[in-house]
């Protein structure tokens, strides 16, 4: 059975190990985080501290954008964009990784403490009963402080999250 995680699209470009799990994983990605990939690719600000790493991550972002723009995948994503909280059909990446895109809606429910994409991650996690996977330790801290009823894992704990019985 596949483990499900809620994640921003850029995490897949930054953390290559997420594309090579030891068992089947499904990543649910809010559509707005896919749109953010275009901004990150076009932006002049570095994403990573090291120039070499930054170039590699920007290349991976380009590959993700190309994947999402492939005709067949684009049609699947467009099916999710017809109604709030609708998910795309599965977009297989490899034998162990499947992506699904969700048209998450920021209801401003957590706008005081979280930005719009973080709010979409939270609401998607609640709706899907799946943990958030992030590299933003401050996000995890704010989730705890605000007593948001979701589970979140740091990317560094990815293998533990995949292996354990951690569904919300």
PLM-predicted stretches and their roles:
Residues 163-168:
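A charged, well-structured terminal subsegment
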């Amino acid at each position: 059975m596949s483990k499900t995680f809620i994640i921003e699209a850029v995490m897949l470009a930054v953390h290559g190990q997420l594309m090579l799990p030891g068992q089947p994983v499904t990543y649910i990605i809010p559509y707005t985080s896919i749109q953010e990939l275009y901004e990150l690719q076009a932006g002049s600000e570095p994403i990573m501290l090291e120039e070499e790493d930054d170039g590699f991550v920007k290349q991976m972002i380009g590959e993700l954008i190309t994947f999402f723009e492939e005709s067949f995948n684009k049609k699947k994503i467009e099916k999710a964009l017809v109604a709030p909280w609708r998910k795309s059909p599965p977009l297989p990446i490899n034998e162990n990784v499947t992506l699904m895109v969700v048209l998450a809606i920021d209801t401003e429910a957590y706008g005081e403490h979280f930005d719009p994409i973080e709010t979409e991650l939270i609401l998607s996690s609640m709706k899907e009963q799946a943990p958030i996977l992030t590299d933003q330790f401050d996000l995890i801290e704010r989730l705890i402080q605000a007593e948001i009823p979701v589970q979140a894992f740091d990317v560094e704990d990815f293998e533990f999250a995949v292996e354990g019985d951690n569904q919300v």
